Amino acid sequence: MSAQRFEYKVVYADLRGRVSVEGDETLIEEGERMTAFGRRYLNSLGVQGWELAGIQHQPMGAAFHVFKRPLAEGQQPEPAKPIKTEPKP
């Protein structure tokens, strides 16, 4: 029997109501409370099997949230998205 393996997702969140994961942003809806926004976002990750594993606080109230979920035997983690760069003229 092999040891349990995990994949990880790093989520950046700030006090303006913005969540960013590898360039994909989710914004707070007009009139939505911050706590409701946080719960909505966390529940969407929970449905996908992600569990909060840690938080790294940043200046100005921002933070990196690290989530993990188990990998099935033989499954590989999702690859990270490449950084989009503009072609140089």
Say what each PLM segment does:
Residues 1-89:
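Terminus-proximal functional modules
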